[in-house]
Amino acid sequence: MAEWHKIIEDISKNNKFEDAAIVDYKTTKNVLAAIPNRTFAKINPGEVIPLITNHNILKPLIGQKFCIVYTNSLMDENTYAMELLTGYAPVSPIVIARTHTALIFLMGKPTTSRRDVYRTCRDHATRVRATGN
């Protein structure tokens, strides 16, 4: 879908963010669009399934790297987002937002606030949800 690549392009132009990817969670659970050669481009189906099925997950593996869950409301229909921190130095904020068909992964730089990452990821997810995807 061309819309996914447009979201990744918009994010990659912004200097506040380090990595971004969009992953299908309904059918194939594969990466649909991502910034090339980064952590989120390596996300595999085995890492996506625990995110959407296990509400009490504490240290998920994302792109073969451990992360620490800060808040988890990913499957909540009103919030549809999960906040994480990287489990390695330098610590960066990560937000995963859920649309009807995909998960939007967004990692900020270590100097970017969690609020900026959360707001940007939720805005993209809300826009996509409004179109029905």
Swiss-Prot record:
Listed name of the protein: Profilin
Disulphide-bonded residues: none
InterPro entries documented for this protein: PFN, PFN_euk, PFN_sf, Profilin_CS
Family: Belongs to the profilin family.
Known function: More likely to influence phosphoinositide metabolism than actin assembly.
GO molecular function, one term: actin binding
Provenance organism: Monkeypox virus (strain Zaire-96-I-16)
Record key words, sorted: Actin-binding
